[in-house]
């Protein structure tokens, strides 16, 4: 026989008006914050990934794939030049 942990049952929480008042604001705000994070370009700057227009340059039209594990830094420097 299981004992009580003293916590409110999940069904009580989900059917609570207070729960929905709080979450009807916070859940959409999370989506808006994520959209702003990506649309402003901050995500590209934070994680260091190239923007979609930076994958291919005028001089380099091939896919920048690192093929040699031990000369990876040299290959990445070639891709950036």
UniProtKB/Swiss-Prot annotation:
Any single Pfam family the record assigns to this protein: Cytochrom_B559a
Localization: Cellular thylakoid membrane
Membrane topology category: Single-pass membrane protein
Cofactor: record remark: With its partner (PsbF) binds heme. PSII binds additional chlorophylls, carotenoids and specific lipids.
Gene3D superfamilies: Photosystem II cytochrome b559, alpha subunit
Residues annotated as transmembrane: 21-35
Keywords from the UniProt entry: Electron transport, Heme, Iron, Membrane, Metal-binding, Photosynthesis, Photosystem II, Thylakoid, Transmembrane, Transmembrane helix, Transport
Binding residues for heme: 23
Single annotated GO MF: iron ion binding
Keyword Lipid biosynthesis included in the entry's annotation: no
Cofactor annotation: heme b
Gene Ontology cellular component terms for the protein in this record: photosystem II reaction center; plasma membrane-derived thylakoid membrane
Disulfide bonds: none
GO biological process: photosynthetic electron transport chain
Protein family according to the UniProt entry: Belongs to the PsbE/PsbF family.
Function: This b-type cytochrome is tightly associated with the reaction center of photosystem II (PSII). PSII is a light-driven water:plastoquinone oxidoreductase that uses light energy to abstract electrons from H(2)O, generating O(2) and a proton gradient subsequently used for ATP formation. It consists of a core antenna complex that captures photons, and an electron transfer chain that converts photonic excitation into a charge separation.
Subunit record text: Heterodimer of an alpha subunit and a beta subunit. PSII is composed of 1 copy each of membrane proteins PsbA, PsbB, PsbC, PsbD, PsbE, PsbF, PsbH, PsbI, PsbJ, PsbK, PsbL, PsbM, PsbT, PsbX, PsbY, PsbZ, Psb30/Ycf12, peripheral proteins PsbO, CyanoQ (PsbQ), PsbU, PsbV and a large number of cofactors. It forms dimeric complexes.
Cited NCBIfam families: cyt_b559_alpha
HAMAP family linked to this entry: PSII_PsbE
Name of protein: Cytochrome b559 subunit alpha
Species per Swiss-Prot/TrEMBL record: Picosynechococcus sp. (strain ATCC 27264 / PCC 7002 / PR-6)
Gene (name only): psbE
